[in-house]
Swiss-Prot record:
Glycosylation sites: N286, N720, N886
Gene Ontology terms: biological process: cell wall organization; chitin biosynthetic process
Region (Disordered): 1-45, 110-179
E.C. numbers: 2.4.1.16
Principal EC category: transferase
InterPro entries associated with the record: Chitin_synth (IPR004835), Chitin_synth_fun (IPR004834), Chitin_synth_N (IPR013616)
Entry keywords, A to Z: Cell membrane, Cell wall biogenesis/degradation, Glycoprotein, Glycosyltransferase, Membrane, Transferase, Transmembrane, Transmembrane helix, Virulence
Protein name in the entry: Chitin synthase 2
Species for this entry: Exophiala dermatitidis (strain ATCC 34100 / CBS 525.76 / NIH/UT8656)
Amino acid sequence: MAYNRLGSPQRDGPYSPSAQPQYDSRSPSPGRPLQPYIHPDEAYARQQPLHLQMPTASDDRLAMQPTYSVENVHNPQAYGQQYGQHLPDSGDMGYGRNDYIVSPEEHHDAYYTQPYSPHPQGDYALDPYPSHDEPYRPDTDNVPILQPDSAYGPDPHTQPGMDYDDYQEEPRPTPSPAPIRRWKTVKEVQLFNGNLVLDCPVPPKLLANVPHAKPPERDEFTHMRYSAATCDPSDFHNERFTLRQRLFAKPRQTELFIVVTMYNEDEFLFARTMIGVFKNIEFMCNRSSSKTWGKEAWKKIVVCIVSDGRAKINPRTRAVLAGLGVYQDGIAKQQVNGKDVTAHIYEYTTQVGLELKGTQVSLKPRSATPVQLLFCLKEKNQKKINSHRWFFQAFGRVLDPNICVLIDAGTKPGKDSIYQLWKAFDLEPMCGGACGEIKVMLDHGKKLLNPLVATQNFEYKMSNILDKPLESAFGFISVLPGAFSAYRYVALQNDKNGVGPLEKYFKGETMHADAGVFTANMYLAEDRILCFELVSKRNCRWILQYVKSATGETDVPDRIPEFVLQRRRWLNGSFFAAVYAVAHVYQLWRSDHSFLRKLMFLIEFTYQTINMLFAWFAIGNFFLVFRLLTASLGTKETLGTAGTVLGVVFEFVYLGTLLYCFILSMGNRPQGNPKSYMMMVIFWSVLMVWLTFASIFLTVKSIETEVQQKDFSFSTIFNNSTFFGLIVSLASTYVLWFVASFLFFDPWHMFTCFLQYIVLTPTYINVLNIYAFCNTHDITWGTKGDDKAEKLPSANVKPGGKVDVLIPQDDGDLNAQYDSELKKFATKPPKEVKAPNPADKQEDYYKSFRSNVVTAWMITNFILVAAVLNIAGFDRINVHDTQQQNSTIYLAVILWSVAGLSLFRFTGACWFLVVRMVSLEIWSVCKV
């Protein structure tokens, strides 16, 4: 394995003999071999680019970054001064360029340290080399570290009119006669273009378990890079932030850029996802015959982890990240030079793997394949779409990847699924996006015992067997699941006017405050908007594909309240996004798709419009089917009076449950009324069993009726409208499901989940749809309030342009901190008991009482009206036409009741007058 040196003082450095043969005869110093000579009182003038042959060292060498380093080098003044001479001036920053290894002048502007002349610009005597035996000497603030004309700006002490007498410097540590440790950290570093960027040594305990460069050499395995981003994601590049992949002697080209977005997932869910990602990278590294991949494939892959809020991240998950080496506590800052930090960015190439033993996460040192990790810890909780902004707009612009893979924490990709997604783009140049099969995590089938999980498993399977392949055949998939999908980075880019897929996609982050309800609900399914905008992109012809061989496993809700809340967002977002796509179908004609492809798109959108109409009228259609089937059971040929009575009972309970569902959905949280929702689910399940029985019973009765006829033939059976309608509808759904499942060699869900799905179908139609449409005003993403994170120290600029950084001081501190993080997930977490918020509990109680009162009020009034008017089933029970008679009697009762009540009130009023008159008379007598 080739190690990527950060700039050894002895090998591959710009001061080494290999870089400058003319200095090969110089004798090494006792302190630091071949250390350049620096006079302490005068900074060197800016050097002219040297037209020399660049060193023939490894392309993976990282350039020395003096102002980034938090290590106590022997001559920090010269160290920073040297870097000041090579400060990048161009705005290009080397992004997307590959010729720096050939052109020293251009590479000079990409943070690479050029060969350095050891001669000072003045006639000062040369200082001797610093020695390890010297005691600690603090920096002198009145000596400029950088050139007056450097990009950091002139030294404040040289500015006329600047007074720093009021500045109180922190006390310096007492000088110690002990030798300086090489890895001893310092408290002061220079800001780089106003940005705080640190190269921090990783704990020696971690290094002891992985291959790495031996001291005094440094590589990407020995140091973690921290950047305190103080800007919006869209300004990350313009603020001259960069990433480690662009700092190698030959900047690495990123073929695969993988993002794992998380909120507060525990260490088990996070490790499950990362294990799947690591296995995919290892799989690609083992493809020795591939032209793209192979042994060094890991250098073309960057794994980005974006956590939505520093106060929200699970501490045990953060400890796992520290175990991997991509996080260190105590380094992050709240502010830098008065600017709030928006994201904390940690970079490290880890060789530590993860493994799961049950639900216990443990580290697996000396992993065969290194992985380039980029951990972005956002300061505030700003939703998942903001996490994607950091991924696409900030980091994507720097790395310029080919393919971007999106994964949610908790989703476990198959061992080669990411490769299969990449392969789809490689085989089809016009593939702009792709998705794999989302599977339900069943825990070896144990979770199928929960009917709700089994139903969702069936739903996912049939979607991946019927819906996704159909849409992929047309070239447009209505939604690429954000849990596991991939996009071609160039296909997502906006045009020169800033209009394009990403512009539409990210509009949902800031528009909720002033957008209409329709638009806000539409952006609950922002991934659907992205898919449509990608296919209809102006002057392009991108298509979307489904990759059956790429799989990702995920958990699904196993309780009714969580299930209802999840589907509320899905249903509202998908419905309004579908309306948007149908209304903007004309945009397809501005693309460069062929006429045949556009015609196929129109056919697909027509199909989706029909599906949307069926979804809109699903509740009405279901009631009509129920009404017709129950009415058919009341005939003499079927169940007679018993069927009629059962039909009336079911109809009353049906309408009452439907009404109760509306009332609950209008103002109650599912978490506050779990028993009520469970009762509704049970009723709809019983009703579906009744309807299934009715369908089978009517079919059998129809066949018996035809068989009993003298002129019976098989053709007469199909002439029976009842039989023919039932058979055609059942065969076109259930039978085709079986056939399609066998064609895809994936039929097992038909045997393990089919019945559960059939029984819970009314719940999907009634409960989920009613709750979704009754809560279209709720445009939240399920993101809870932003908790206040623990305040971090700030990095304030001191005279001389330096800031204080308080980090672990030595190996012992680093190891102690590392051990502390490992202990956080070394044992099983205590069982989490969610204590209900007292305020929420009281509010749920009040809302539940209100809903029950309103329900009782409406149902009793409905029964009264139905009984009097002989409707809602009473007309079927009472065969005589008694509607007029009942109405007359009821009207008479009402009139006499009104008269009686009026007479009663009149009597009371008269009695009041009598009492009043008598009282007045008595009062007058007594007064006299």
